[in-house]
Amino acid sequence: MKPTQPHPVIPVNQLRPGMYVIAIASQTGAMEIAQTGLVTTRQQVDVLIRRGVLTVKVDLARSKLPGIAQVISPSPAHSAGSVRPAGSGEGRELKIRRLYQEARELQGKFIRHLKAGEPIDITPLAAVAEEMVDTMFTHGDAMLCLARIRAKDAYLMEHSMNVAILLANFGRYLGLDRSVLKELTLGGLLHDVGKIMTPDEVLNKPGKLTDEEFGVMRQHVVHSYDILSNTAGITPTMLEVAANHHERLDGTGYPQRLKGDQLSLYTRMSGIVDVYDAVTADRVYKQGMQPTQAFRILLKGINQHFDAELVTKFIKCMGVYPVGTLVQLSNQRLAVVMQRNEQQPLKPVVKVIYHTTQRHYLEVQWLDLARNGGQESIESTVDPKEFGINLANFV
């Protein structure tokens, strides 16, 4: 059914090449579209998402996308297992995106003030960390989806954001008190702040570091400790995340070469989370691993680098197919994992988006693999780059 309004407002992640944009309807930043016009590439959509655009107003008459009415207002007919996730909707999605963007902006402001030698106040970041924890309890999967959105040129802030989200998720799974989760989340947001002291030629080197350069890189942990220990409002737990996330069980970590029982629960948690996010991230000099590959790295390091029990629990809390993972279904369609299924981990709720043999995007469909009578199942995980898919458009 065609929308009754000629200029519907849609979430930016529904924007497709062929749609004609006439205005930004809502956003988190101050960016404005220089000129209205036809969207011709997915890269244009990516730019809008990265700059904080949340919704856009589309002109149906001037759009050139076949079946645009169906894209904006999907057909009410659903196959077996089709779902509308509980608590879903544009309002919830926009709220969570705003929270994510607000945290990113506050991170940037904190770092700018540090570099300029200006007074710093963690109160706004502490407030957003508390809101992130609250959201993890109500819409945790949606938060984890945002942790899959990455840009190679923004690694430092995105890595810290993701570590914060992953620590909140891990801590919730372990049953930690909310006050502790808030500290871990804020510690994650600030855990790599000392890298502002690391020379860019070392921090962003497109290749393997020399021994001397690696020594310089290691100093970021000391810098983080020095900065945060002199910042009002920083707790011992937050300091521990920043100072100890590179320590390892066998004493091969840094900077203090702590060993065994010297590594607290929070240190062990932050080490696991930091490595998981780092190896799954795309960098200028390397392609990120898929989550299942990252799990293998963690499992390979148990009892040497990582606590075996905690690694097992981390993998369980993330799920066999972590939220935000692109998977191939048994009918050659690609889907993004959107919600975990703790009772049946192999059957999450997914969002179907693409056909691999016909090589084209599909009308987005939510599908609960536990409720489709076995009609479809996951065959494998897929690297989005193989099909030129940007997950930011679908999570």
Annotate each predicted stretch with a short phrase.
Residues 1-120, 376-395:
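Membrane-cytosol interface segments
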Residues 93-94, 98-395:
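Histidine- and acidic-residue-rich, metal-dependent catalytic cores
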